[in-house]
């Protein structure tokens, strides 16, 4: 279990407010694909829908049949499907065209508040529509979005928009594309299309390939846009749309490394956080199922939210954190939304306080490294996991936010070796006087930069120091840092410039990067942006030798 702690001396300065531009950049547009059978919804730029459910509305056939079951006037989506024997089901969309606006409004309400759990007035919305949708329907959709849900802006796109294609992964980077395509469940010829990182309005096609020399790997092709509106990879084969281009290469490789065989599989996405007015939830909405671990300030449980969403729940012991502080932290953490940060969903602010987050199936990186699966990890896999942590920290660096307790125990591992940073920001709110850099075993001295341990000067550069220690945990597969030394010895030695020796099996160039993070002058340490780039490109250049 991961300890939630804070230093009790030299309290760090309060978190500065986020700049307006940074906050504005994080307001993602919502995409809702209103299909005849299924509704798909999510955030623009995500690699998969956040919610997929049947486009149905059900009502009780007979009054009184559902007494004691929390009877409602109507049920939507999966809940309606599960009660189909005692409900009358209706489909408000036929052939992509809305035929029942009252029921359609219920589906959109369910999409915003139950599936995506967002405040619609905070997000622009992109709705897809059938090609033959009448103009009156388009106007009605827009009217409901503005008048009922108060959305700030609305755009209706044809249902054949690239956004609706299962192979379109939106705004993901080259490295993430490789991660996804090389994960289990994909074979040679698996592919995805993503936004170009370098050319606005263009796309990239990423394909999984294999050869004897390189084994499994990914090749990338730029999809260029013609001035006339068409698309091409090579000028001899031009197409009116990206969909037509993809279909062509499904039928013939025509110069590509392989035929396009299947869209890249995606992990089932975790639902993003709750609406701004729903961070405070009722304890009765959470069911604790299994204790995952115990720490000095409480337990971590596998739980269910509203009986349908798998979550991780931190139960804090009374006196650990004030209810007011827990809600303040929830509001701050809502602004920090990134694929490599564990998403906070909600809090139960009455003691014992519950902190509800997304669930990561493999638990902490530290425990995972000690298991057999972790012991079998290769150097490229370990470096990729480090790159993911650096990516999350580079985002926090851009947002002027500090972690304060970065170590393998506070990194969580999910499916396909996805790593996410947990417990960011919680350390500074814990009300416990024993968590002291000069005394008490709870303080993680071995991970803490000397200026933070001795004087409480926590900055993003002290996080960089901690990241260097985390790298040794990764390479050594869970070994405690500074083996054979106690906290006092570590502090004394580090203050005089001592560095841990190179871990067994660690390339010299990677150890060099570790040593850069341990420079005594914080300003001489590298940025997380640099560390992310270094680690992502580690096996593309000569530095690994």
UniProtKB/Swiss-Prot annotation:
Q: Which reactions does this protein catalyse? A: L-tyrosyl-[protein] + ATP = O-phospho-L-tyrosyl-[protein] + ADP + H(+)
Q: Where is this region: Actin?
A: 23-157
**Residue ranges annotated for the Protein kinase domain, each copy included:** 286-539
Tell me the InterPro entries matching this sequence: Actin, Actin/actin-like_CS, Actin_CS, ATPase_NBD, Fgr_SH2, Kinase-like_dom_sf, Non-receptor_tyrosine_kinases, Prot_kinase_dom
Enzyme Commission numbers on file: 2.7.10.2
Phosphotyrosine-modified residues are 435
Protein family per UniProt: Belongs to the protein kinase superfamily. Tyr protein kinase family. SRC subfamily.
Additional remark text: This protein is synthesized as a Gag-Fgr polyprotein.
Extract the PANTHER family matched here.
TYROSINE-PROTEIN KINASE (PTHR24418)
Protein name per its UniProtKB record:
Tyrosine-protein kinase transforming protein Fgr
Query: Upper lineage ranks?
Result: Viruses, Riboviria, Pararnavirae, Artverviricota, Revtraviricetes
């Amino acid at each position: 279990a991961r300890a939630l702690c804070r230093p009790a001396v030299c309290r760090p300065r309060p978190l500065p407010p986020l700049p307006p531009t940074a906050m504005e950049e994080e307001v993602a547009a919502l995409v809702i694909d209103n299909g005849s059978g299924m509704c798909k919804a999510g955030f623009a730029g995500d690699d998969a829908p956040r919610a997929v459910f049947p486009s149905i509305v059900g009502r009780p056939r007979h009054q009184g049949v559902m007494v004691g079951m929390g009877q409602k006037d109507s049920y939507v989506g999966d809940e309606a499907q599960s009660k189909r024997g005692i409900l009358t089901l209706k489909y408000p969309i036929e052939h992509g065209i809305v035929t029942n606006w009252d029921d359609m409004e219920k589906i959109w309400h369910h999409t915003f508040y139950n599936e995506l759990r967002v405040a619609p007035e905070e997000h622009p919305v992109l709705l897809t529509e059938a090609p033959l949708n009448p103009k009156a329907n388009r106007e009605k959709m827009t009217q409901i979005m503005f008048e009922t849900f108060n959305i700030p802006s609305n755009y209706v796109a044809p249902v054949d928009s690239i956004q609706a294609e299962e192979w379109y992964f939106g705004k993901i980077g080259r490295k993430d594309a490789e991660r996804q395509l090389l994960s289990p469940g994909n074979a040679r010829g698996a592919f995805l299309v993503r936004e170009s990182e370098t050319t606005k309005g263009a796309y990239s096609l990423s394909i999984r390939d294999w050869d004897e020399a390189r084994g499994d790997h990914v090749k990338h092709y730029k999809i260029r846009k013609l001035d006339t509106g068409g698309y091409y990879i090579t000028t001899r084969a031009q197409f009116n749309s990206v969909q037509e281009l993809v279909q062509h290469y499904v039928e013939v490789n025509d110069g590509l490394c392989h035929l396009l065989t299947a869209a890249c599989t995606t992990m089932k996405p975790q639902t993003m956080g709750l609406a701004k007015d729903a961070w405070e939830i009722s304890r009765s909405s959470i069911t604790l199922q299994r204790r995952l671990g115990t720490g000095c300030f409480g337990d971590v449980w596998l739980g269910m939210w509203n009986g349908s969403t798998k979550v991780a729940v931190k139960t804090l012991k009374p006196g650990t954190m004030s209810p007011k502080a827990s809600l303040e932290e929830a509001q701050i953490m809502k602004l920090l939304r990134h694929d490599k940060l564990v998403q906070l969903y909600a809090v139960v602010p009455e003691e014992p306080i519950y902190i509800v987050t997304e669930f990561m199936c493999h638990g902490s990186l530290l425990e995972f490294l000690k298991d057999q699966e972790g012991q079998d990890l290769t150097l490229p896999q370990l470096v990729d996991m480090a790159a993911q942590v650096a990516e999350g920290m580079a985002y926090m660096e851009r947002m002027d936010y500090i972690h304060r307790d970065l170590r393998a125990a506070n990194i969580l591992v999910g499916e396909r070796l996805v790593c996410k940073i947990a417990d960011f920001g919680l350390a500074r709110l814990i009300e416990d006087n024993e968590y002291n850099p000069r005394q008490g075993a709870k303080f993680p001295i071995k991970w803490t930069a000397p200026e933070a341990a001795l004087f409480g000067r926590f900055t993003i550069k002290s996080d960089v120091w901690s990241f260097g220690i985390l790298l040794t945990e990764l390479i050594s597969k869970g070994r405690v840092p500074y083996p054979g030394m106690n906290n006092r010895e570590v502090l004394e030695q580090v203050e005089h410039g001592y560095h841990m020796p190179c871990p067994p099996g660690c390339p010299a160039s990677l150890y060099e990067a570790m040593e850069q993070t341990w420079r005594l002058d914080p300003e001489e340490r590298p940025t997380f942006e640099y560390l992310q780039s270094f680690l992502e490109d580690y096996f593309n250049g000569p530095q690994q030798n």
